[in-house]
């Protein structure tokens, strides 16, 4: 009789499992994305923030790990350890891109080429793609601002820049270098500038560096020097 009872219990459990409702697949859509800055305290890391709206159609909390959900940003894949409450919910997903693990991805992200971003998972052996898009945040060149005889470089980017190069004026070249804070400015320091060159037009030949990631050259011109009255 014991084997019969065991078989009966197993059959009952099997029927209950078959009747139990399966979890419905959640939905997700990307609302916005931004580069949030550059960490340098523990080595350079570019911070990417993604604002995502999730929808859990089930009447119970749903762990995304159930679907093996992961966020892919170029060559980087980040497993999502989130539990969604029933209904809709917004989350900001942060991704750290370091030169050691994601140099190519970070460089592509800061170029016009951009990088592919996708939220993926799987259920019952089937691949799931919640969303897939391409993000690009090209490096913006600094802007020159004049205040009297002083000139300032404004950095419109959300990360700091190391700037070095030359001011070419009236056939002469003067060394320029500075560190620009994120979305900040710095006074243009010209090494070797001499009186008598205050009036004229020239150009700035600069190399911009995102510390730890890449360097980019550009020329800003015409560059006018106008003495104060």
Language-model-detected regions and their locations in the chain:
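Hydrophobic beta-strand positions in extracellular immunoglobulin-like domains
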Residues: 53-54, 123, 153, 167, ...
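Bacterial Sec signal peptide processing site at the extreme N-terminus
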Residues: 18-36
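Asparagine-centered strand-capping/turn motif at beta-strand->loop junctions
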Residues: 54-60, 151-159
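Short, solvent-exposed loop/turn segments enriched in Ser/Thr/Gly
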Residues: 44-51, 111, 145-150, 199-202
């Amino acid at each position: 009789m014991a084997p019969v009872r065991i078989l009966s219990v197993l059959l009952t459990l099997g029927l209950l499992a078959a009747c139990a409702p399966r979890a419905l697949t959640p939905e997700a859509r990307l609302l916005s994305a931004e580069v949030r800055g550059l960490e340098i305290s523990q080595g350079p890391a570019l911070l990417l923030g993604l604002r995502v709206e999730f929808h859990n159609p089930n009447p119970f909390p749903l762990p995304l790990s159930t679907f093996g959900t992961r966020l892919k940003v170029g060559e980087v894949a980040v497993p999502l350890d989130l539990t969604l409450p029933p209904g809709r919910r917004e989350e900001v997903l942060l991704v750290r891109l370091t030169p050691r693990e994601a140099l190519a991805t970070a460089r592509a992200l800061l170029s016009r080429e951009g990088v592919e971003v996708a939220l993926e998972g799987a259920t019952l052996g089937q691949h799931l793609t919640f969303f897939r898009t391409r993000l690009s945040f090209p490096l913006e060149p600094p802007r020159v601002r004049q205040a009297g005889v002083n000139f300032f470089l404004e950095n419109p980017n959300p990360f700091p820049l190391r700037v070095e190069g030359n001011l070419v004026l009236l056939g002469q070249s003067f060394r320029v270098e500075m560190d620009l804070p994120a979305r900040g400015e710095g006074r243009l320091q010209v090494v070797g500038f001499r009186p008598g060159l205050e009036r004229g037009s020239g150009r700035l030949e600069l190399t911009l560096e995102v510390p730890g990631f890449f360097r980019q050259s550009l020329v800003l011109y015409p560059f006018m020097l106008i003495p104060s009255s």
